[in-house]
């Protein structure tokens, strides 16, 4: 697995490394998503990672590896939300892999949400995928979203304290927040712990994973609320990023 050609049509070694194998229909949808990204990238800057291993490892594999438990119970009804969905990762890939899930995709860039809606329709996912064009701070205070999700996630959005402030208010009492991280250090952990005390949530899992083909190291962080999130969070638009909790 040393070059792009190895993943022009992924073989079983990729799925063996993941510990999950898509059905033929799911694989076709993932290949179709790749083609749609190529088309939309000509109009909207969604992602540069659309070819070969860039797509199959850096996008698909990286979106799914933290979700082992969910993948083993793929038909289970659950509500998920992806904040800062961008080109649809992890949200659209998750919608393909978890046929029992309803997925909400959130992005503040109108051109990206238009692309997400169009791609979801082409993939036959419209009945289970909702797209919202708005800032995450608004989503977290909207009664239609606040406190309603089994899984809230964000990938490549901001620092961990900022992302936690976006995600924790969205969780139902039994729900979990999933933060996709690259580098993770003791100082990062200290900063997140300060934020979680204010959000009344705990870090329940941290897992490190090396991507196939020497594509780098990733971490997943799982959070769970200990008490209802204080109504003041998330703070008004722009404040979480300018003044991260605990800083």
Swiss-Prot record:
GO molecular function: rRNA (guanine-N7-)-methyltransferase activity
Compartment(s): Cytoplasm
EC number(s) stated in the UniProt entry for this protein: 2.1.1.-
InterPro entries assigned to the protein according to its UniProt record, in alphabetical order: rRNA_ssu_MeTfrase_G, SAM-dependent_MTases_sf
Role, per record: Specifically methylates the N7 position of a guanine in 16S rRNA.
Top enzyme class: transferase
Keywords from the named record: Cytoplasm, Methyltransferase, rRNA processing, S-adenosyl-L-methionine, Transferase
Positions with a binding annotation for S-adenosyl-L-methionine: 84, 89, 136-137, 155
Listed name of the protein: Ribosomal RNA small subunit methyltransferase G
Organism: Prochlorococcus marinus (strain MIT 9313)
Top-level division of the source organism's lineage: Bacteria
UniProt KW Cytoplasm keyword: yes
Protein family: Belongs to the methyltransferase superfamily. RNA methyltransferase RsmG family.
Signal peptide positions on this chain: none
A cellular-component GO term for this protein: cytosol
Main localization category: cytoplasm
Gene: rsmG
